[in-house]
Structures are given as C-alpha cells and as structure tokens.
A protein has these predicted regions:
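Bacterial N-terminal signal peptides
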Residues: 7-17
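Conserved ankyrin/ankyrin-like repeat signature
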Residues: 37-38, 70-71, 104-105, 134-135, ...
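Ankyrin repeat A-helix N-terminal signature
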Residues: 29-34, 62-68, 96-102, 126-132, ...
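Ankyrin repeat domain, specifically the short helix-to-loop turn at the C-terminus of the second helix
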Residues: 43-48, 73-82, 107-114, 137-145, ...
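Ankyrin repeat boundary signal
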Residues: 51-52, 83-86, 115-119, 146-149, ...
Length: 220
C-alpha cells in the first residue's frame, strides 16, 4: 500500500512538472506573437516572468528580439521582472534594445532602473555598433562610460568605426571618447575604420588620436 502511494505521488509530481513546463512554453509562445493578454494571464497564474527558454533567453529578452512591443513594455514595468537579467551570451535587455534601435524600450528600461553600465560589452557598445546616435546620446546622458572596454578591450568608438557610423563617431568624440586606445588585437578606432574600407573616417580618427596623444602625453 505504501509503495502504491509512492507511485501516485511520483505520478502527481511528474504531472505538475509537465504542466509547469507546458505553461512556460505557453508564455514564450505568447511573448513571440506579442499576445499581451496571454502573457498577463500566465504571469497572474504564477508563471515566473524571469524564466529562461531553452536558449537561455528571458521572456523580456525574447520580447525585445521579437519586436513584441506591448509585451516588452508590460514586462519592463512588471515589479517582479529583472530588467538586468543576462542571457547565455551575457547580453542584457538594454543591450539588445539598443542594438535593435528601440529608443522607446531603452528609455523604459532606464526609467525602470536598469543598469546602463556593466562589465564587458555594454549597451553603449551595442548602440554604437547599430549606428544609433539618439540611443548613444541618451546612454551618455545617463552616465554610460564612454570608453567602456569589452573583454578584448574594444571600445564603443571602435564599434562605431567598424560599422562606418560617422555620426556616432562624431558624437562620441565630441563627448570625449579616447580615439588613441588600442584593443588586444592591436586595433584602434582608426584601424577598424580602415579595415571597414572607410579611409576618410580612418584619417579623421587618426587625426583625433594624434591630437589626444599630444594633449595627454604618457607619464614617465
């Protein structure tokens, strides 16, 4: 009799686990199609809004990737949602919103208290890579570190140069970005621009780098 009870308990636990997994799958399905009512109902039923999918993305990250604007706004505003939750690639929702040119979502994330700065790649790197001057300026207004270094010491200015985004380079230089920095691949911002085939931008960046070095001579 006791053994039979254990079997029933095990079956019940399996059923609960399967139901939870199915509900989590339902959450991500609703997120991807921007089904706000469905997402709200699932969260109200107790589904964790911070749960990750099989790829390691949270519901908020999936919403941003899927351009599910209504769901993304709902999740950003939800008090239980972690606005800084990273995925397996260590990307935050703000980084992805910046890369996808979603100024509106970046603004919402900042208002929600999401971190503008973090170690490694940052939202400013992603905005510079996307060539979005508005987001770059917004992040700088909220104290984004202008010379933030990726794990291999690549800066936002280098990413802007890599994408041949002249307007972003100009904005970063105007705000004081250091064009003389070199990453671990021995590339400066000018070097990135040259590799991208934009000699005019490379010359501009090298000129600025020379001026920077003259103003900031090495301490001996």
């Amino acid at each position: 009799m006791r053994g039979l009870f254990r079997v029933f308990a095990l079956l019940a636990a399996c059923a609960v686990g399967a139901a939870f997994a199915q509900s989590a799958d339902d959450l991500f399905t609703a997120v991807k199609i921007d089904n706000l009512r469905g997402v709200r109902n699932l969260v109200e039923r107790g589904i964790d809004p911070n749960a990750n999918d099989a790829a390691g993305d949270s519901a908020l990250t999936v919403a941003i990737r899927s351009d599910a604007s209504n769901v993304a706004a709902f999740l950003i505003a939800h008090p239980e949602v972690d606005p800084d939750r990273r995925n397996n690639a260590l990307e935050t929702p703000m980084m992805l919103a910046a890369f996808r040119n979603r100024l509106d979502l970046v603004e919402k994330l900042i208002a929600r208290g999401a971190q503008v700065n973090n170690t490694g790649w940052t939202a400013l790197h992603y905005a510079a890579s996307a060539g979005n001057v508005e987001i770059v300026k917004l992040l700088l207004e909220h104290a984004a570190y202008i010379d933030a270094e990726s794990p291999n010491k690549t800066t936002p200015l280098m990413m802007a140069a890599r994408g041949k985004h002249r307007a972003v380079c100009d904005a970063l230089l105007e705000e004081g970005a250091d064009p003389s920095l070199i990453n671990e691949r021995d590339l400066s911002a000018a070097g990135f621009a040259l590799r991208a085939g934009d000699r005019e931008l490379a010359d501009l960046l090298e000129k600025n780098a020379a001026a920077w070095r003259s103003r900031h001579p090495p301490i001996r």
